[in-house]
Design a protein with these regions (language model features):
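Catalytic cores of the polymerase beta-like nucleotidyltransferase superfamily
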Residues: 1-503
Length: 503
């Protein structure tokens, strides 16, 4: 791989390692991509692999979806892609982007490409919508990228490396910088501030001082970005292998005050008597511990909670957001947070709804927040079978996530206390497993259904059937499965004590 722009040789060892990785990855670049480069060259146009795929090559990662930039117009690009691919489509012609797919051959995966004409966007002050203008140079196109590590390219088919802004040196040094001034870059598109936090999590990059200073000064600008775009960046951050650095960027720069204010609010002041822990740091630790308890991956979904699991991670991060509103200093110097799980569930629902998360995710995270303290009543292992059934029923399909959230919520440094909690939860899981051997716990129902209730009581459909059903469900919770005759008699006894209204 040749280079058209030499980079700062420091740190030399890190640069050399990155270059070796890139050579390995780019050597395995899909032959179809190189063929595509030749097709553009034959038509008199430039084509370069740009952005994330180039960055990832230096990190030793491969990308299935490939992004290209070209000197060709969208119309010219479409003609070339129609010949190269098995399918092509208009992604955003007004933005210069055409997509194509070449189907799998000889066992290789499909090759999907997006090709965009060189652009030199201009933004009006205070606007996040660019005036799109097509450019004529690769360097000009790279200058509009968000960060230098994403402003690298490889010309095809020659495999010439292009790095006008020192992105490779920044990647080797582990620093996140912008190709133009950070103020200008974030004013052009404030979402780039969220992307900075996301890359801190995904790539382990630290923010250049100019980038950090600009975010601190411009955090309020994120308000003009749609909630959906903010949500998507937050989701990508949380699904990183280690979200903590990205979350710390959000909080430390003030960006979280705008997009997730409940998180920085957890930095409760620690008084001189240390009467409570820093709930913010506790929550970050719970998140890390929950991630460690995920099972398998989305690619290899083994176990009950394959990671990365967004619902579990959101619940781990936000489970204590009700504490600031419920904090009380009690006599004797203690601090209480009574009912913070209920208050927190409401806050979680409100915030995630505002961020446009889907209803299922909102309900699940709010429910886990509401239930995260339920286990602590089991500390002395005195729950009845009925209480265990209710625990399982209340958690429903979230039970495996609740197991992991509850275990992760123990961050005490007191080893004896931590062991006690762990042993107690082991015992609860054992109790659940034993009950499952004898009865169905996944969806507990009364031993009689609605039709049977009506037949025994000699009544038709109506509210009385529902009341009887709820009574039998309570019996099922309390006593487990019972003989049908016993349940039928219990139903008649209930009907005698609770006659229909008006009789």
């Amino acid at each position: 791989m040749s280079t058209s722009a030499p980079c700062d040789p420091q740190p030399a060892a890190a640069l050399a390692a990155l270059q070796r990785r890139a050579l390995s990855v780019l050597a395995g670049l899909a032959p179809e991509a190189l063929e595509l480069g030749s097709a553009f060259a034959a038509a008199g146009h430039e084509l370069a692999l740009v952005g994330g795929p180039v960055r990832d090559a230096f990190l030793g990662r491969t990308s299935q979806d490939l992004d290209f930039a070209t000197s060709a117009t969208p119309e010219q690009t479409e003609v070339i892609l129609a010949r190269w691919g098995d399918a092509h489509w208009d992604i955003g012609r007004e933005f210069g982007t055409i997509g194509a797919r070449r189907f799998a051959r000889s066992g290789a995966p499909d090759v999907v490409v997006e090709v965009t004409t060189y652009r030199t966007d201009e933004y009006e002050t205070g606007s996040r919508k660019p005036t799109v203008a097509f450019g004529d140079t690769l360097d000009g196109d790279l200058s509009r990228r968000d960060f230098t590590v994403n402003a690298m390219a490889v010309r095809l088919p020659s495999l010439t490396f292009v790095d006008p802004f020192g992105g490779l040196a920044d990647l080797a040094a582990g620093v996140l910088r912008t190709p133009v001034s950070a103020d200008q870059s974030f004013d052009d598109d404030p979402l780039r501030m969220m992307r900075a936090a996301r890359f801190a999590a995904q790539l382990g990059l630290r923010l250049d001082e100019d980038v950090r200073t600009a975010i601190e000064a411009m955090a309020e600008r994120i308000e003009i970005v749609s909630a959906e775009r903010v949500r998507d960046e937050l989701t990508k951050l949380l699904l990183a292998a280690d979200p903590r650095p990205g979350l710390e960027v959000l909080v430390d720069t003030g960006l979280a005050d705008q997009v997730l204010p409940e998180l920085p609010a957890l930095r409760l002041e620690i008084d001189e008597h240390h009467r409570h822990k820093d709930v913010y740091q506790h929550s970050l630790t719970v998140l890390a511990q929950a991630i460690d308890l995920e099972t398998g991956t989305h690619e290899d979904p083994t176990g009950p909670v394959p990671g990365p699991d967004l619902v579990l991670r959101l619940a781990a991060l936000l489970h204590d957001v009700g504490k600031p509103a419920t904090r009380r200093f009690e006599a004797g110097g203690t601090v209480s947070f009574h009912h913070h799980e209920l208050v927190g569930a409401k806050l979680v629902k409100k915030r995630l709804t505002a961020l446009r998360f889907d209803k299922e995710t909102v309900r699940a995270v709010a429910r886990l927040t509401e239930l995260h303290l339920r286990f602590h009543g089991y500390g002395d292992q005195v729950w009845t079978d009925s209480a265990v059934r209710r625990y399982v029923t209340d958690a429903g399909p979230l039970l495996e996530r609740l197991h992991r959230l509850t275990r992760s919520d123990s961050t005490t440094r007191n080893r004896r206390k931590a062991d006690h909690l762990s042993f107690a939860y082991d015992d609860l899981e054992r109790r659940i497993a034993e009950l499952r051997e004898h009865e169905e716990l996944a969806a507990i129902r009364p031993d009689l259904d609605g039709q049977q209730i009506m037949a025994i009581l000699g009544i038709g459909p109506g509210p009385r059937v529902g009341a009887a059903y709820r009574h039998l469900l309570e019996l099922r919770m309390e006593h487990g499965p019972q003989d049908r005759a016993v349940v039928a008699q219990a139903l008649r006894d209930w009907a005698t004590v609770n006659p229909p209204s008006g009789t």
